Design a protein with these regions (language model features):
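Juxtamembrane/interface motifs at transmembrane-helix termini
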Residues: 25-26, 65-67, 158-159
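Catalytic beta-strand-to-alpha-helix segment of the class III nucleotidyl cyclase homology domain
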Residues: 35-145
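Intrinsically disordered or compositionally simple regulatory linkers and C-terminal tails
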Residues: 143-180
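Catalytic NTP-binding/metal-coordinating core of nucleotidyl cyclase/transferase enzymes
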Residues: 1-47, 53-54
Length: 180
């Protein structure tokens, strides 16, 4: 248990300053997860890339049982602020996107994708995904840490990883026709 707490402390010491230095605000800790908001989507993406790369480098020098691999899910939308917390459908979508991100990676919503200068990043569509307790399928993208990582994984390999992890890719047109 003390080993797990040591890893959690290292996790927080890596993520928290990066969030703050990228115009982010930590809303709360939820177990080993951190819920944060940022001034802009680009700030959120850049912070996420930095701490994912820090964990990647750290893991390359650590024993496997000491690896820290986190999932990042980013979404942009309207929220309700109450008692220094955030609520609303946008919060739920962000949380659900995080849950489908492969360990050690970043998944972003279409709203984040549209607000970025996508030429600055390596991004591949993960397709439309039905997220738990979210009415309509969401277009989700995998944001790669660098060009090499992007080139190392084909679109087919990304789709295959969804199948292996039980993530359903949905044709939104067919889905809407079946819902009517």
């Amino acid at each position: 248990e003390s080993h797990a707490l040591k890893l959690l402390d290292e996790h927080n010491q890596t993520i928290e300053p990066t969030i703050k230095s990228h115009h982010g605000r930590i809303i709360k800790h939820i177990g080993d997860a951190i819920f944060a908001e940022f001034d802009s989507p680009a700030d959120a993406v850049d912070a996420s890339i930095i701490f994912q790369n820090k964990f990647k480098e750290r893991n390359s020098l650590s024993r496997r049982e000491d690896h820290i691999q986190i999932r990042v899910g980013l979404h942009k939308g309207e929220v309700v602020v109450k008692d220094d917390d955030l609520f609303g459908n946008a919060v739920n979508i962000g949380s659900r996107i995080e849950s489908i991100a492969p360990p050690g990676s970043i998944a972003i919503s279409h709203e984040i994708y549209e607000s970025l200068d996508v030429d600055l990043y390596s991004i591949r569509s993960m397709g439309h995904v039905k997220l738990k307790n979210i009415k309509s399928p969401q277009q989700v993208y995998k944001l790669y840490l660098d060009k090499n990582e992007f080139e190392a994984e084909s679109e087919n390999e990304l789709q295959q990883s969804h199948i292996e992890r039980g993530i359903d890719i949905i044709d939104p047109q067919t889905y809407e026709e079946n819902e009517i």
